[in-house]
Amino acid sequence: MTPQCFLKTLKTAKQTYTFSIYKLLLNSSSINQTLASPETPLSDLNLSTLRRILSDPDIKSWKCISLFNFILENPSLFSFQPDLRTHLSLTFRVLSERRFSYAKELLKPVAIDDILRYPFNVIVSSVIDECGCEKKVVGRFFNSMIMVYSDNGKFSEVVEVFEYMKNNEVKIDEKTCTLHLLNLKRCDQMELARDFFSLMVESGIDVVTVYSLTVVVTVLCCNGEITRARELVEEMGLVKGVKANIVTFKSMIGCCVKRWDFEELDLVLKLMEKESVMLDLDSYKVLIDGFTSYGKVEEAERLVLMMHDKKLRVESYLYNLIMNGYSRFGLVEKVIELYSEMSSRGVTPNKDTYWVLMNGLCKAGKVCEAMSFLNELRVNEFEIDEEMYSTLSEECYRVGMIDKSLEVVAEMIRDGFIPGATICERLADSLFEVNRKEAQMLITIVVKCGIKPKSCSQYGLK
């Protein structure tokens, strides 16, 4: 602003509203504190004066907002209340400065407040009557209206605003539409989300993006409509030129895997290949988890090999999933083979890896091999938990390795775990038969667990 214009504006300000208020707003650093002081000339303020203040370019917009909020929060101090026109005037001012969060806060009372709210058609009429703003600011206003309605659950009003903007050629922001879809999804309004997306598509306006498509695909998948989601992805690619990305496909992959719908999964993966969308690290993890949980262990192993070929980081837990899958089928040789491959490819085994190995070997009756991995656990300084100890002691006993079972129980006790009463009683029975002194120790442990074993009466113990 030139010095001449500034002096002219200042002169006008002096003439149109009380100079004390004007000076207050120009110089004060804290509007609320100043207005609350007894010296403040609040009686000089009326609705007409307020409107001129709020539109004055010499007064910072943040000061206008503070003054406006002070009036709303302290109605008893004023003989008037800001009307719709005043709300809109300040809203358009902050929107012209791209202060969107302030604009939404200013719109809340007139859009959703139980007492102050106005119907949308009344707000539109006021905008038409009062607005002299440029087209892009008007667009910001209506997009802000959509978000205020959406954030506060007024979903039918969102459609009303959308229709108005479409019919009056007001630019609809694609981000606004996506955020509204996310709000609908968050509120579990799946049907409304589908309907709104259809409205976006049918409007003929370029507002459908990969982001809004992904939200709707996720909504459809949450409802179990995987086929519809896949068909929508194909349709949007052909009709709108909107290509799905890996995030879109991950929603469908995750849904197929959770439902063990491998027929549909195959179609989704083929569509990915057709669209030249590559699986990422997370997609591989989801697929491997799904295949192993269903029992498609070989497919899961094939995916791990693909990950290695593509130089993707393969974590030990992925090998653990596959090894555990083979273990469930009793294919302990495959478990050992995978463990060897894991080491050769530089993937460091963790505690769970050893647990899968030991558990699988025990189930196959290969207890000695399982015990060797227990020693490897100690060498690698992994913590041995109670379940590992219990399994090994029971399996050693089952195959007749009484001394080994006793050794595991003793180590278990040294590590602060209490052995199960059943294994202690079984070991005690076996040791009593050969008059081993360790039997008494085991019976004592059982009794301390609150169980009276048969061995007590059988061998004359009380």
UniProtKB/Swiss-Prot annotation:
Gene3D superfamilies per the UniProt record, alphabetical: Tetratricopeptide repeat domain (1.25.40.10)
PPR repeat coordinates: 138-172, 173-207, 209-243, 245-279, 280-314, 315-349, 350-384, 385-419
Superkingdom to which the source organism belongs: Eukaryota
Keyword Protein biosynthesis: no
InterPro entries for the chain: Pentatricopeptide_rpt, PPR-containing_protein, TPR-like_helical_dom_sf
An example Gene Ontology CC term for this record: mitochondrion
Keywords: Repeat
One of the GO BP terms on file: mitochondrial mRNA 5'-end processing
Protein name stated in the entry: Pentatricopeptide repeat-containing protein At2g28050
Pfam family, one: PPR_2
Family affiliation: Belongs to the PPR family. P subfamily.
